Amino acid sequence: MSVAEQIRTIAAEARQASFAMAKLASAAKDQLLLDMALALINDAPHIIEENKKDLEAGQERGLSAAMLDRLMLNEARVKGMADAIREVAQLPDPVGEVTGMWKRPNDLMVGKMRIPLGVIGIIYESRPNVTSDAAALCLKSGNAVVLRGGSEAIHSNLAIATILKAQLAKHGIPAAALSLIPFVEREGVTEMLKQEEFIDVIIPRGGESLIRFVVENSKIPVIKHYKGVCHIFVDATADFEMAREIIVNAKTQRPGVCNALETLLIHKDIAETFVPFIYEALSSLKVELRGDKTFRQFAPKAAKATEEDWYAEYLELILAAAVVDGLDAAIDHINRYSSLHTESIITGDYANSQRFIREVNSGVVMVNASTRFSDGNQLGLGAEIGISTTKLHSFGPMGLTDLTTTKFIVYGSGQVRP
């Protein structure tokens, strides 16, 4: 069969498997996930060995340090993948939940019940842990899932998917409930995006070019997981030590991920003292700072920021920085340049914190906390499918509930419409 025919078959079989998944009891889904987690631990040496093939190929292709970090699996990261699956197993099952019930004047009882979306297609790059995270969330929420990972992680993804699919068979669940498209060519993505008859939604996770390609070519509704141009605004009332701890964590703990800090905004009233303070802290950790004119006035060694820097997701130890007139200017800057991912304010002023929360137009808005907490696990969702920067059908980190929709249920006692 051609690539197009094979992908159509994968999608059609996933559609059939989705009906079985939708009927699966919560206890059965939970046991499946627990067995999947154990299988990952038991087969960790094989996963790591396959991952080495991807890392070697990535080094030969000249992938950046950030990309290689996203790609790399070791024993601790495989354990983290298994732990994330276990966390999903422990979460309440949203399927079948009645979210409201009301009585009409004619005594009809009307309600809304959560149901699976059906078949979810996920297209992603670099991070092989997405394979297990996506499988766990989609299966727990009663969906079938069709995965298409990046060519740079093909060996890792195939190893993980094969291990997980084996557990489906052991539990008597159609193996097509979890499929990984094995074709690394772009044709595989193109054909997947044509399967509107079988796939209900596409969730792309990756770089700007991938997101744009999916949006422009998909016949299926898309929930975008765009880049993370994350901001922190240091207000005039901020505690300097708290601000330093948060900023250093947000920028340097793991710079190659989408919730790392990319732009720092500083209130003009504290610029004279705070800019040298934070410049010294970050430059000592090898962070390159690119500042506007006022920032460079107080940190002369900083590089000059250009217009492109305000839009940049660096994913490395580079940080854009600007001094702003106040809260209004900070909010305006964020709403202009943000990718709608995650923003944080460091402040001692409650009123300012509430204005920031209300007026900043992003999926996650924080007060006195690192942007690195913008993560499904950290926010109590369990493993996340990603962080949506699309307001429909979900916004921010997507957990189990975000992989369901609702249908109306109506109870009558013989009513007919007059």
UniProtKB/Swiss-Prot annotation:
The name of this protein is Gamma-glutamyl phosphate reductase
Enzyme Commission number(s) of this protein: 1.2.1.41
User: Key word NADP present in the record?
Assistant: yes
Principal cellular location given in the protein's record = cytoplasm
Subcellular location(s): the record lists:
Cytoplasm
Q: Cellular component per GO?
A: cytoplasm
Function comment: Catalyzes the NADPH-dependent reduction of L-glutamate 5-phosphate into L-glutamate 5-semialdehyde and phosphate. The product spontaneously undergoes cyclization to form 1-pyrroline-5-carboxylate.
Q: Which pathway is this protein assigned to?
A: Amino-acid biosynthesis; L-proline biosynthesis; L-glutamate 5-semialdehyde from L-glutamate: step 2/2
GO molecular function annotations of the record? glutamate-5-semialdehyde dehydrogenase activity; NADP binding
GO term, biological process aspect, one? L-proline biosynthetic process
What species is this protein from?
A: Citrifermentans bemidjiense (strain ATCC BAA-1014 / DSM 16622 / JCM 12645 / Bem) (Geobacter bemidjiensis)
